[in-house]
Amino acid sequence: MDPFRKAIKGYDHDRIPVWFMRQAGRYLPSYMKYRQRMGIEEMMSSPDVIVDVTHDPVDRIGVDAAIIFADITTPLSGMGLRVRFLDSVGPVVENNIEKSGISAVEEFDPSSFSHPVLKAISKYRERYADPLIGFAGGPVTLLSYIISDGVDRDLFRVKRMMITEEKAYQAVMTRLTDMIIEFARMQISAGVDAFQIFDSWAGYLSPGEYEHFVKPYVYDILQELSGSIPTIYFSTMTSSYVADMDLPADFYSIDWRIDMKRFSAEIPDEKGIQGNLDPAIVNYDYALHEASKIVEAASGRDRYIFNTGHGLLPSTDPEKLKRLVEYVHSVNL
């Protein structure tokens, strides 16, 4: 069994596994070759393109796992939502809640949902033996995309809905939660080895807001998936309360704002940790210094995966990233 599969399942392993969020992205020459002739939507509609872009970091960078090339808005079409990708903006939901009301957010029916990304997962599994990670956005993060034109990054509109339209908020969050569970099961059936939830904007919530308005839904997702696949929960800017989340995730993926040594001491030994290098420093020699500190701080844990604390930047130098991977792999356990 490879180091990633061993680490995420809690088995002994002889080297620290490494992968990066957004490793199949704009910093790679192979990705940019596709982008020169195809839009994002066209790329994500081709299983063969998805497989190629997904696997390239394994070959080029030497990471220990691939993450399927997709977007967190991918399954929203199965809820009756129309998503467009705009240059320099990203995904925009045309029939968002502010325009069309919560009735626009339909119940997700897995029996009628088909997407090229699911076929791509199956194709990837047929072609390659290395670990493959599936994913979905967290429910409140997805809500930030469907509530208005463009993403509500600071959750201003989401918070207004939480407080002034709580029943509507609960109805939408329940539908998103049900969809995420079903979409995860579809990815598991197609062949992914682990599943990560991206709650990128959770840090805009206070600890109390998260506990009351978000945690019950995230908890339900992770509980439903428990035992069927190793799970990773990623959030950013949550340093003040991530150790107290008490979620049934197998791993917490943390950002660079959290001290690894302190966090490791605060959570149960059976929980895994993933992270947490600042992606902005990857191109500099200083990244190796920071990586050594992170790895040393996590050295007492059996379940640890090296990663950045958020997605890689388009300016990332592939050769510098490869050097970082080689360095982490060289650390003696």
Curated annotation (Swiss-Prot):
Q: What does the entry list under GO cellular component?
A: cytosol
What is this protein identified as?
Uroporphyrinogen decarboxylase
A Pfam family per the record: URO-D
Pathway given in the UniProt record: Porphyrin-containing compound metabolism; protoporphyrin-IX biosynthesis; coproporphyrinogen-III from 5-aminolevulinate: step 4/4
Species per Swiss-Prot/TrEMBL record: Thermoplasma acidophilum (strain ATCC 25905 / DSM 1728 / JCM 9062 / NBRC 15155 / AMRC-C165)
Subcellular localization is given as: Cytoplasm
PROSITE patterns, alphabetically?
UROD_1, UROD_2
Keyword set includes Secreted:
no
- Transmembrane residues, as ranges? none
Q: Give the matching PANTHER family.
A: METHYLTETRAHYDROFOLATE:HOMOCYSTEINE METHYLTRANSFERASE RELATED, UROPORPHYRINOGEN DECARBOXYLASE
**Reaction catalysed?**
uroporphyrinogen III + 4 H(+) = coproporphyrinogen III + 4 CO2
Q: Which UniProt keywords apply?
A: Cytoplasm, Decarboxylase, Lyase, Porphyrin biosynthesis
Subunit structure, interactors included: Homodimer.
InterPro entries reported for this sequence: UROD/MetE-like_sf, Uroporphyrinogen_deCO2ase_HemE, Uroporphyrinogen_deCOase
| GO BP terms in the entry | protoporphyrinogen IX biosynthetic process
Q: Site Transition state stabilizer: which residues?
A: 71
> One GO MF term, please?
uroporphyrinogen decarboxylase activity
Name the enzyme group at the top EC level.
lyase
Q: Which domain of life is it from?
A: Archaea
Q: Give residues annotated as binding substrate.
A: 22-26, 71, 145, 200, 310
Give the protein's biological function: Catalyzes the decarboxylation of four acetate groups of uroporphyrinogen-III to yield coproporphyrinogen-III.
EC number assigned by the record? 4.1.1.37
The family note in this entry says: Belongs to the uroporphyrinogen decarboxylase family.
